[in-house]
């Protein structure tokens, strides 16, 4: 399916080719990271399955965000529907149409950044292609990585896709408003599965519909932004 990571190739990709691909991506990611740092922006790589609620989470973030200035790029194989939804929500947004690629890479993000003004932006979201496998291994230059996991997906998702959950800074459990309609499903069950593969990764439960948990999510983002501001101040030789 994808020529850049080789997940759709029938033959095994030689290690040296894979390493070259990742090295090239890492160079572009370093450039993106410097770009975000220069603008004082918290960059969030938001990953998750198709239908996990990534776009709805960002829409709810805009509604609950008060004076926070938000911007985003949205990756999909086709259409710019998610980016248009974000624009309607008041988020500066551009779409990245990947064609057959099942994840974003740093070069795609870099090209999209040329069309977004970052001055004055507090939080910048990279809404990755819906996928729990390949996006985890590609550095995009983000400050933090987050995975959205819906309560409808099954509490064993962290066990089935451990690499994703071990590579993120936060799990956002979405669609909490559906819990009353899902017998036997609980936040605790998801938490137990997550702890088996990623004991230290925090989990925040939210509902984009009711607003439950949104302040916890915003507080987490704000704290990460303070972290980068503190680090920048410490690195300033003046």
Question: Language-model segments: what does each one mean?
Answer:
Residues 179-235:
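Canonical P-loop GTPase G-domain recognition
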Residues 1-11:
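Long, basic/Gly/Ser/Thr-rich N-terminal segments
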Residues 135-142, 149-200:
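Conserved C-terminal guanine-recognition region of P-loop GTPase G domains, centered on the G4
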Residues 129, 147-150:
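Active-site segment flanking the S-adenosylmethionine/decSAM binding pocket
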Residues 5, 96, 204-206:
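Hydrophobic residues at beta-strand termini and immediately following loops
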Residues 10-34, 38-47, 52, 56, ...:
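Nucleotide-state-sensitive switch-loop elements of NTP-binding domains
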Residues 49-50, 73, 77, 150-151, ...:
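G-domain G4 guanine-recognition motif of GTPases
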């Amino acid at each position: 399916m994808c020529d850049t990571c080789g997940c759709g190739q029938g033959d095994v990709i030689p290690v040296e080719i894979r390493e070259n691909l990742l090295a090239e991506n890492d160079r572009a990611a370093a450039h993106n990271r410097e770009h975000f740092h220069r603008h004082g922006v918290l960059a969030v790589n938001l990953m998750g399955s198709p239908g996990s609620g990534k776009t709805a989470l960002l829409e709810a973030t805009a509604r609950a965000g008060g004076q926070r200035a938000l911007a985003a790029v949205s990756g999909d194989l086709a259409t710019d529907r998610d980016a248009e939804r974000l624009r309607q929500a008041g988020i500066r947004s551009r779409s990245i149409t990947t064609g057959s690629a099942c994840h974003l890479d740093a070069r795609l993000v870099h090209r999209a950044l040329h069309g977004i003004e970052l001055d004055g932006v507090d939080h910048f979201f990279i809404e990755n292609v819906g996928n729990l496998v390949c996006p985890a291994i590609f550095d995009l230059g983000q400050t933090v990585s987050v995975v959205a996991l819906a309560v409808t997906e099954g509490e064993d998702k962290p066990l089935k896709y451990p690499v994703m959950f071990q590579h993120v800074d936060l799990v956002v459990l979405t669609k909490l408003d559906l819990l009353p309609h899902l017998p036997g499903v609980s936040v605790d069950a998801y938490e137990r599965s997550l702890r088996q593969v990623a004991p230290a990764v925090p989990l925040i439960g939210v509902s984009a519909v009711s607003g439950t948990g949104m302040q916890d999510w915003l507080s987490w983002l704000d704290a990460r932004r303070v972290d980068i501001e503190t680090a920048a101040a410490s690195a300033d030789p003046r």
